Amino acid sequence: VLIIAVLFLTACQLTTAETSSRGKQKHRALRSTDKNSRMTKRCTPAGDACDATTECCILFCNLATKKCQVPTFP
């Protein structure tokens, strides 16, 4: 009896999830792009002000000058 109850509850959850996701496909796609835009960080170009929390574009933040700059290799 317990196995039958578990199978019944599992089937109910699957059909409920399938039914509710059909009408919300458009909204799910919108949420996905919103999430991606929040996850995308903007970077600071060379010469702009920066600090320890700033993400410089393919550069590094020179904390002495507080500006993003290209690394120089000896």
UniProtKB/Swiss-Prot annotation:
<feature type="propeptide">
    <location>
        <begin position="18"/>
        <end position="40"/>
    </location>
</feature>
<dbReference type="GO" id="GO:0008200">
    <property type="term" value="F:ion channel inhibitor activity"/>
</dbReference>
<feature type="disulfide bond">
    <location>
        <begin position="43"/>
        <end position="57"/>
    </location>
</feature>
<feature type="disulfide bond">
    <location>
        <begin position="50"/>
        <end position="61"/>
    </location>
</feature>
<dbReference type="GO" id="GO:0090729">
    <property type="term" value="F:toxin activity"/>
</dbReference>
<keyword id="KW-0732">Signal</keyword>
<dbReference type="InterPro" id="IPR004214">
    <property type="entry name" value="Conotoxin"/>
</dbReference>
<keyword id="KW-1015">Disulfide bond</keyword>
<keyword id="KW-0960">Knottin</keyword>
<comment type="similarity">
    <text>Belongs to the conotoxin O1 superfamily.</text>
</comment>
<feature type="signal peptide">
    <location>
        <begin position="1"/>
        <end position="17"/>
    </location>
</feature>
<keyword id="KW-0964">Secreted</keyword>
<keyword id="KW-0165">Cleavage on pair of basic residues</keyword>
<protein>
    <recommendedName>
        <fullName>Conotoxin AbVII</fullName>
    </recommendedName>
</protein>
<feature type="region of interest" description="Disordered">
    <location>
        <begin position="19"/>
        <end position="41"/>
    </location>
</feature>
<dbReference type="Pfam" id="PF02950">
    <property type="entry name" value="Conotoxin"/>
</dbReference>
<dbReference type="GO" id="GO:0005576">
    <property type="term" value="C:extracellular region"/>
</dbReference>
<feature type="disulfide bond">
    <location>
        <begin position="56"/>
        <end position="68"/>
    </location>
</feature>
<keyword id="KW-0800">Toxin</keyword>
